[in-house]
UniProtKB/Swiss-Prot annotation:
Residues 33-58 form a propeptide. It comes from Arabidopsis thaliana (Mouse-ear cress). The lineage of its organism: Eukaryota, Viridiplantae, Streptophyta, Embryophyta, Tracheophyta. This is Protein RALF-like 18. Cell signaling peptide that may regulate plant stress, growth, and development. Mediates a rapid alkalinization of extracellular space by mediating a transient increase in the cytoplasmic Ca(2+) concentration leading to a calcium-dependent signaling events through a cell surface receptor and a concomitant activation of some intracellular mitogen-activated protein kinases. Residues 1-32 form the signal peptide.
Length: 103
Protein backbone atom coordinates (compact mmCIF):
# COMPACT_ATOMS: atom_id res chain seq x y z
CA UNK A 1 0.00 0.00 0.00
CA UNK A 2 2.83 2.38 0.85
CA UNK A 3 4.61 1.69 -2.45
CA UNK A 4 1.42 2.47 -4.37
CA UNK A 5 1.09 5.77 -2.50
CA UNK A 6 4.69 6.73 -3.33
CA UNK A 7 4.14 5.82 -6.97
CA UNK A 8 0.95 7.90 -7.07
CA UNK A 9 2.70 10.92 -5.54
CA UNK A 10 5.56 10.65 -8.04
CA UNK A 11 3.13 10.37 -10.96
CA UNK A 12 1.17 13.42 -9.79
CA UNK A 13 4.39 15.44 -9.43
CA UNK A 14 5.55 14.51 -12.93
CA UNK A 15 2.20 15.34 -14.50
CA UNK A 16 1.88 18.63 -12.63
CA UNK A 17 5.41 19.64 -13.59
CA UNK A 18 4.65 18.97 -17.24
CA UNK A 19 1.27 20.72 -17.35
CA UNK A 20 1.69 23.69 -15.02
CA UNK A 21 3.89 26.61 -16.05
CA UNK A 22 7.26 26.81 -14.39
CA UNK A 23 7.86 29.85 -12.22
CA UNK A 24 11.34 31.29 -12.09
CA UNK A 25 11.64 33.44 -9.00
CA UNK A 26 13.52 36.67 -9.67
CA UNK A 27 15.89 37.13 -12.56
CA UNK A 28 19.46 36.19 -13.31
CA UNK A 29 21.90 37.51 -15.91
CA UNK A 30 23.02 35.14 -18.65
CA UNK A 31 26.08 36.00 -20.72
CA UNK A 32 25.97 34.75 -24.28
CA UNK A 33 29.14 35.07 -26.40
CA UNK A 34 27.70 34.04 -29.76
CA UNK A 35 24.27 35.68 -29.56
CA UNK A 36 22.75 37.61 -32.43
CA UNK A 37 22.29 40.72 -30.29
CA UNK A 38 26.03 41.18 -29.73
CA UNK A 39 26.42 39.17 -26.54
CA UNK A 40 24.67 41.57 -24.20
CA UNK A 41 23.51 40.25 -20.87
CA UNK A 42 19.98 39.03 -20.96
CA UNK A 43 17.66 38.97 -17.99
CA UNK A 44 15.59 35.82 -17.61
CA UNK A 45 12.30 36.70 -15.94
CA UNK A 46 9.26 34.51 -15.32
CA UNK A 47 8.89 31.96 -18.07
CA UNK A 48 5.59 30.73 -19.44
CA UNK A 49 6.57 27.06 -19.33
CA UNK A 50 9.38 24.70 -18.43
CA UNK A 51 10.15 24.24 -22.12
CA UNK A 52 11.10 27.93 -22.40
CA UNK A 53 13.48 27.57 -19.47
CA UNK A 54 15.19 24.53 -20.99
CA UNK A 55 15.56 26.31 -24.35
CA UNK A 56 17.22 29.28 -22.64
CA UNK A 57 19.60 27.00 -20.78
CA UNK A 58 20.53 25.14 -23.98
CA UNK A 59 21.16 28.45 -25.77
CA UNK A 60 23.73 29.42 -23.15
CA UNK A 61 25.78 26.21 -23.58
CA UNK A 62 29.11 26.44 -25.38
CA UNK A 63 29.29 22.89 -26.71
CA UNK A 64 27.22 20.15 -28.28
CA UNK A 65 27.13 17.01 -26.18
CA UNK A 66 27.88 13.60 -27.63
CA UNK A 67 24.30 12.34 -27.25
CA UNK A 68 23.05 15.06 -29.59
CA UNK A 69 25.68 14.15 -32.16
CA UNK A 70 24.94 10.41 -31.99
CA UNK A 71 21.27 10.88 -32.86
CA UNK A 72 21.98 12.64 -36.15
CA UNK A 73 24.26 10.15 -37.88
CA UNK A 74 24.10 10.17 -41.67
CA UNK A 75 22.77 7.04 -43.33
CA UNK A 76 24.85 4.88 -45.62
CA UNK A 77 24.20 5.45 -49.34
CA UNK A 78 22.93 1.89 -49.86
CA UNK A 79 20.69 2.03 -46.76
CA UNK A 80 22.37 -0.90 -45.00
CA UNK A 81 23.31 -0.61 -41.32
CA UNK A 82 26.88 0.27 -40.46
CA UNK A 83 29.22 -2.59 -39.57
CA UNK A 84 31.56 -2.22 -36.58
CA UNK A 85 35.05 -1.11 -37.49
CA UNK A 86 37.94 -3.53 -37.16
CA UNK A 87 40.61 -1.24 -35.78
CA UNK A 88 43.38 -3.67 -36.71
CA UNK A 89 42.42 -4.09 -40.41
CA UNK A 90 40.26 -1.16 -41.39
CA UNK A 91 42.46 0.01 -44.25
CA UNK A 92 43.31 3.44 -45.47
CA UNK A 93 40.67 5.62 -47.10
CA UNK A 94 39.63 9.24 -47.35
CA UNK A 95 37.08 8.63 -44.57
CA UNK A 96 39.71 7.48 -42.05
CA UNK A 97 41.97 10.42 -42.87
CA UNK A 98 45.07 8.51 -43.94
CA UNK A 99 44.29 8.41 -47.66
CA UNK A 100 46.80 10.24 -49.86
CA UNK A 101 45.56 12.13 -52.88
CA UNK A 102 48.19 11.62 -55.57
CA UNK A 103 46.43 13.22 -58.53
Amino acid sequence: MMNNMKLLIIAVMIISAALLPALVVGSRPVKCDNCMDGGEKEEIMKMSSGVDVSHRILQAKRFIDYEALKKNLPAKPDGKPDKPDNKYRRGCSAATGCYRFTN
